[in-house]
Structure formats: C-alpha cells, structure tokens
Amino acid sequence: MNIPLVELTSRRRRGKPLLLGLATMTMAAVGTISAAWFGGYRINLTPSEPLGLWRIVKIDRPSAVGDLVFICPPRTSAMREARMRGYLRAGLCPGGIAPLIKSVIAVAGQRVEVGVSVNVDGHPVPSSALALRDGQGRPMKPFSGGIVPTDYVFLHSPFSGSYDSRYFGPIPAAGILGLAQEVLTYAP
C-alpha cells in the first residue's frame, strides 16, 4: 500500500507535539523529585509518626532529649532481623534500611531502665509499654537497660507498635541525618 508523502509527513508532525509533551512532563517530574530529595524532603508511610511529607533539617549541634530526628540505624544483626521481620522498610541507609523518624529520649550518660515500660533517670516515659510479641505472635526481645554510651542516643516513638530503642537499645548519634520537620502530614 502506498501512502502519499504529504499524508505520511502530516502524521509525523502530529506525533511530535505528543512526544515532546510527554518528554517535557517526564523531565519536569524527575526534576521535581530530585529537587525534593536533595532538598531533604521525604515521605513517611509508617505509623510511628504522622503520615505524609517531612523535611530533614540539618543540625549543627549534638542531639538533645526531645529532638525528633531522622536517623539511619547501624548495620547490626538486630537491624537485619528487624528488616527480615518487616519492622523496618527498605531504604538508602547502610544495610538497605530506610531512615527512622524517632524522638531522642536519652543521651550519653543517662540511665535507661526497661521493664514493663521504660524509665529514663528514674522517670517513666509515657506510651513506652513493651510488647512481648509482635503482630504475628513472634517473641520480642527488649533491651536490657543501662547507661547510654558516649555518642549514642536512645530513641522512642509513642506508637505502641513502634520498633525503637526499647528493643534495639541505644544507637550511634552519628547516624542522625537531621531534625524531622513536618511539612504536610496526616495523623490517622
């Protein structure tokens, strides 16, 4: 079948604006996502803190009690097991784990006691009851307690199902990416 040259050229011209539009939208989307990523924006899909858009705000001081932080957990057997059990999501931190959003409730030199719930320097931490088993009935092993070492932090989330320092103990403060700032969030 012969298609006249004029008709073939006309079809090519009609397809070019569509391709150009798709390419432009794709580049704009990639640019926006890249700018957001490098600007410190992250999406939280875990129930430990409100769902939605968060921002990592750099800090130029040591972390303090009360700071809500983004932190990369260390590469430990406890973290690998937590990832395998589904407590932690995949991400870009060492060990392939996503950063955690948690509150710092104890810093170096503070005494943490873990029993039915958590006490820091003899003061009870609200919403810190321990779970003996996870949602699938598997046993949970709590941290035994002790003094938070130098350059470490003890983390907590008030969400009852949170996997935090109640179970894995203090972790290196060097993993802190920055303060966690809510941008556009929703607390279910």
Swiss-Prot record:
Keywords: Conjugation, Periplasm, Plasmid, Signal. One of its GO terms (biological process) is signal peptide processing. It is found in: Periplasm. It holds the Pfam family Peptidase_S26. GO terms for molecular function: serine-type endopeptidase activity. The keyword Signal applies. Residues 1-28 form the signal peptide. GO terms for cellular component: periplasmic space. InterPro entries: LexA/Signal_pep-like_sf, Peptidase_S26, Peptidase_S26C_TraF. It comes from the Bacteria. Belongs to the peptidase S26C family. Involved in conjugal transfer of the plasmid. This is Probable conjugal transfer protein TraF. It comes from Sinorhizobium fredii (strain NBRC 101917 / NGR234). The gene is traF.
